[in-house]
């Protein structure tokens, strides 16, 4: 039903300029950069097909079973494919998303981040840390991310390296890529396609539904800076360079033979028509037996690759035109050890050409691009929160359809009033879908009407035979604030973002939605391959099984449970005298988050009592619990003791050094934490490091019996990356370490 065309585009360097096509009433074609009024526009005289009644899918629905029967409404959302303009603030917490706690050694503070978005974790944008101690290190965040639900949502993770690709819950190849400012990727479910696309329909086989298309190489978008271009190249893994060729006209195009179409999807039942325009909307392809020299059908021979060429292809893309990544200040111990030292380009060729990605298309066909025939109904613009719920997304899609319908009706009335005769026919377009971008081409001239990078697509819904495509507006950095507005009555701090909504009509509406979802999955797999990661090594189920078999390292629990270590102390002091202590946080990841005694003033009440030791954890003071309170609050409580003469403390006697035991069965399992200058600065929740007792903000003192206090950062990273089996470490709070080593002057309270 749909054809494939080979799209000759460079890696993320497509021309975003709009080339006008013969659309009704000479309207200006649009791109993702142009401004639209909130009411949008449609070609005059366009008639909207009847909208099938649709109710939004319930929130708890995790998977749509796409079958030919019943309601075909489905929707895709890519909440994480944010452009840089929308990176202000972290997304709201959603279930199933991995959280991290970031420790900043410069100011002893903690930052909580979701998937480390905005924290610059990928090897393409980490901000230098303002400290002389920072050592250069190569970023290696290749976490095995938590699974993503398949309710056509792409939650978590954009971008390609400015963002993160969505990760399917049931997809065996799962990993988290960090610092994805735009996070755009979707991974489709493995279910729901076999019944909808059988190998044979009524016993008859037909030609491939897709065909490839050739096009001229487009120029680089002038408004994107080089970082965005590099990011798009790295993440999208755009198609290999193809010799540019002019579009063949319908009369002079090469006659396609039975072998000219690449077999993209299992053939599906389709009615054949001798002319494209007699039965719109129709897929572009006709079965071979229906083709004859008189047909005005456009046909293009796809460029094929031999099995020997395909493994080399991602390598060529990665190496073509890329700048060297910026130097990093952190090392994230989450990938196979060979990621540290072996150049990624040496590993790509050994991986399978393509990993099976659930969906109606073959992965290689989505790399090259596929074409769907559709009718363009119109576009409008909506204001939306950054990460609305799925139900709100569906309501927005229905609102866009309603607006377009109203505008069509108004245009029809205007035509009738002006006695201009019948309304013009619908604008026929080719919807080009690839793992890099989505383009809308005029069906007759093949000129670009709209062009959106895949990472900017936030949502797609099919409602009956209507397809709604939502994309984030792409603005220059200097104008990034222009796309953020606040609507009257909106909650304070709730920013509104401009979304451009395109509405199409097609018999293949559901297939289009599924194909775009699969394109996100393919883009994610190609991102892994470009970064030297074998997707087949990243089975989330296998990693989850390992986690489930490991028990929490309970050294702390045993220590806290021992009543001999829990003490209630009474300290005497003079009125107006400070307690004379320095306290620091125990560190996120500790079994009881409280404050630790890091230093005592000589001759002060705490030191005079002889009952306290450095490393003791303070549970309460004068009956006020300190567990779970911020450090500043705890310090304020201690300062409030100045005018008292007696202080009652509940403490747990602890050594200043914490013992950690990480069980890593194989090098392919990520450790799940990152290190900066020997300090643990982030930790993956639920990973083997957290289970082993790793704490954010702690300084690594010893690894497997070897002191690393004076060891260079790179050697610490190498030692951890190469460790397998049981990894024993000793750590202490970084602030305590600096006090004990004289790097900081204590401020007693």
Curated annotation (Swiss-Prot):
Residues 185-270 are annotated as: STXBP1-binding. Residues 1-94, 130-343 are annotated as: Disordered. Transmembrane segments: none annotated. Residues 568-653, 659-735 form the PDZ domain. Residues 305-315 have a biased composition (Basic and acidic residues). The modification Phosphoserine is found at residues 11, 208. GO terms for cellular component: cytoplasm; dendritic spine; plasma membrane. GO terms for biological process: chemical synaptic transmission; protein transport. Residues 366-555 form the PID domain. InterPro entries: APP-Binding, PDZ, PDZ_sf, PH-like_dom_sf, PTB/PI_dom. The keyword Transport applies. This is Amyloid-beta A4 precursor protein-binding family A member 2. It comes from Pongo abelii. The gene is APBA2.
